[in-house]
Amino acid sequence: MSKNFGVDSSQIDTLLEKLRLASGIKGKAMLDTYVQFAARYLINSDAQELAQLDFEELTADVEQAWSFVQERKTSRPLVRLDQSERRELGRATPITTLRVLLDDKPFIVDSLRQALLRHGAAIMEVRNTVLFCGRRKAGSKAEGYGRFGQLAALSNSVDDDFSVEAFCSISC
């Protein structure tokens, strides 16, 4: 199911199965899309970083990221800041996560990261991926996909019906 980039494949497969069971998503097709998204979102993560995260915190992060990519109405970038807490050594540390979804552009993650660093942000983790998204506008026919609307499917490669979108999540 997974390739080994930053995370051991058995580690990511175990996490994906736990996420599948915890998701509460109805319908096999959408559940499979959710697991595919989670795999793409987590695959470049540092193995030690993932091992240290509490499963509930990781689940919340994946759920927030999944919720964020659900609808894209225009070609303008989507940007959102999420606030949360991370528990470390018995104390809560506030976390701000910048999430950005836009048409795929080279070096976008590095540009965002550098801008945050220039403004004094202490970056804790960066997760980014390229998504091949099949979207449908409300009320549109069931066959075929477009660039905008509700996320209906993900692909593993470029396809004429799927838009290429860059998604990144930077926690400070």
Locate predicted features.
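Regulatory modules associated with amino-acid/nitrogen control
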Residues: 1-121, 128-129, 135, 139, ...
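A generic structural motif
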Residues: 156, 163-172
